[in-house]
Amino acid sequence: MNYYVGIDGGGTSCRARIRNQQGEWVGEAKSGSANIMLGVEVALRSVVDAITQAAEQGGLSPDDFPSMHVGLALAGAEQKEAWHAFMQQAHPFASITLNTDAYGACLGAHLGEEGAIMIAGTGSCGILLKGGKQYVVGGREFPISDQGSGAVMGLRLIQQVLLAQDGIRPHTPLCDVVMNHFNHDIDSIVAWSKTALPRDYGQFSPQIFSHAYCGDPLAIELLKQTAADIEMFLIALHHKGAERICLMGSIAERIQDWLSPPVQQWIVKPQSDAIEGALMFAGKPEHNLYKDGL
């Protein structure tokens, strides 16, 4: 029997879902980061770990991997060099098809029909599928892109907290959260920043939301800025022809109330998720982002 696996991999986690050839659910699991820009070996290891755990739920084992066609919707796959490096790795599966996490999410959100999505989680990216073509805005990775993401919001938070420590801007309760995290040691923040990954900055986003709802001025400022960034991408997608846009990801799903009313009118609920989108192209090499790979 053949099995089909959908993978949704981002900067924070990798989620796997297995279905049999009748489309019946077999198992689902989550592992670590699968952003291929952070290392193709790490990403493949996370993929295999998630599939292994999901397989166990359905009474399967690694012996069944050669019967599995895997659709990979991974962050960072838009980078051609990284895409090729990932695809050149040895793997135990029947086939792998690799496209971006945004592509998988858009397919899932509109069940394969035309439409657009705006993803904002650890990273951010907007994508429109229309007329057989793919249009992308943003998504060029932290720190040079990914506006509207948890990572950029967390970076801005750290910057503002340091300004508050210097007496340049007012200190708020949200500043205390960050300083407590680093044991009130600015040198620790500086040292941490030298190796901090997008998910490390993104870890502060839940606190930003909760403090904004409590009226914290800094948190409100950060959310307004994040909403403006996301709205910028939504307008760009609309100009490219998007009539229906789904908000996806931990930040985007919570930011809708912060968007302007005209923009909110374009928002629709996703019909499914990125894992289902990845399942749609499992075993279908024509969905590979680049066609000259292995």
Curated annotation (Swiss-Prot):
Keyword Cytoplasm tagged: yes
First-level EC class: transferase
Keywords of the record: ATP-binding, Cytoplasm, Kinase, Nucleotide-binding, Transferase
Localization of this protein: Cytoplasm
Reaction(s) catalysed (UniProt annotation): D-glucosamine + ATP = D-glucosamine 6-phosphate + ADP + H(+)
Any one GO BP annotation for this protein: phosphorylation
InterPro entries the UniProt entry points to: ATPase_BadF, ATPase_NBD, Euk-type_GlcNAc_Kinase
Domain of life of the source: Bacteria
E.C. no: 2.7.1.8
Temperature-related activity annotation: Optimum temperature is 40-42 degrees Celsius.
Binding site for substrate: 101, 139-141, 146
pH note: Optimum pH is 7.5-8.5.
Molecular function via GO: ATP binding; glucosamine kinase activity
Family, as annotated: Belongs to the eukaryotic-type N-acetylglucosamine kinase family.
Function recorded in the entry: ATP-dependent kinase, which is specific for glucosamine. Does not show kinase activity with any other sugar.
The name this protein goes by in its record: Glucosamine kinase GspK
Source organism: Vibrio cholerae serotype O1 (strain ATCC 39315 / El Tor Inaba N16961)
Taxonomic lineage of the native organism: Bacteria, Pseudomonadati, Pseudomonadota, Gammaproteobacteria, Vibrionales
